């Protein structure tokens, strides 16, 4: 079967994958009290090497640590898996025995406390648009949708039409989208839980905020006018304009990551 390059959602690195493979990501959201610097140091110097070794041992595909820009004591760790089978069989990633083999010194855990603040939901990555530069900041968009296909179609069209131009105009722009596979809650036939997510990257916080800011009397950009019309037309053809009933946006800084290199 023909292979294509599946870009890890929040990373420039590429991996080869079959078209029908199911690539997963799991979120671990937490809140930390105490010494934030010590917490970050523990993850960079102890847990990151263990995560990297787990990739080499094919226990998972990648590890990332993000910190909230607006609430600096909040973090989200993203774990990547090449398949549901890899997720199911992944064990002892942060094993003390492995740490000993690697010569890692246990961090001082007395200077901070952490607690998990949300279910560790598993998402399927279905769309990725990767540029040629690193994203150091991310806009995370959480969505509620009733029609999965509309959500998927809309984001695939965004990746194909809009993201390509964004990558020309904005350094560090990378984009990806995924759907929640492990939790859904309906009330009166309406989705009340967030069941979709997308990420839009930027090289710097300045760039990200500038791109999102309102600009008065901005000149019409004919290129973007044309792209916007094409995107709108294609979305209407697919019937994917009303793809979400709610949206929540947060901004995150990339603290560290490893893909086994």
Spell out what each predicted region is:
Residues 3-13:
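Sec-dependent N-terminal signal peptides
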Residues 2-3, 26:
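Basic side chains
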Residues 17-100, 104-261:
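Short S/T/G/P-rich N-terminal loop/turn motif that feeds into the first structured element of a domain
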């Amino acid at each position: 079967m023909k292979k294509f390059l599946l870009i890890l959602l929040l990373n420039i690195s590429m991996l080869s994958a079959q078209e029908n493979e199911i690539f997963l990501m799991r979120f671990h959201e937490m809140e930390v009290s105490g010494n934030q610097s010590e917490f970050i140091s523990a993850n960079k110097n102890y847990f990151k090497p263990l995560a990297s070794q787990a990739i080499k041992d094919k226990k998972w595909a990648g590890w990332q640590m993000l910190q909230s820009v607006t609430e600096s004591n909040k973090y989200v760790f993203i774990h990547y898996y090449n398949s549901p089978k890899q997720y199911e069989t992944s064990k002892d990633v942060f094993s003390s025995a492995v740490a000993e083999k690697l010569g890692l010194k246990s961090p001082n855990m007395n200077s901070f406390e952490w607690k998990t603040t949300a279910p560790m939901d598993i998402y399927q990555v279905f769309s990725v648009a990767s540029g040629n530069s690193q994203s150091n900041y991310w806009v995370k968009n959480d969505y509620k949708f009733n029609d999965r296909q509309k959500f998927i179609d809309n984001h695939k069209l965004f990746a194909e039409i809009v993201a390509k131009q964004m990558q020309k105009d904005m350094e560090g722009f990378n984009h990806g989208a995924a759907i929640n596979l492990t939790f859904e809650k309906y009330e009166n036939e309406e989705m009340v839980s967030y069941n979709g997510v997308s990420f839009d990257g930027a090289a710097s916080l300045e760039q990200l905020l500038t791109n999102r800011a309102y600009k008065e009397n901005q000149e019409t950009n004919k290129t973007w006018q044309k792209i916007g019309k094409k995107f709108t037309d294609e979305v209407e053809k697919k019937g994917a304009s009303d793809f979400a009933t709610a949206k929540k946006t947060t901004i995150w800084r990339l603290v560290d990551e490893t893909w086994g290199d």
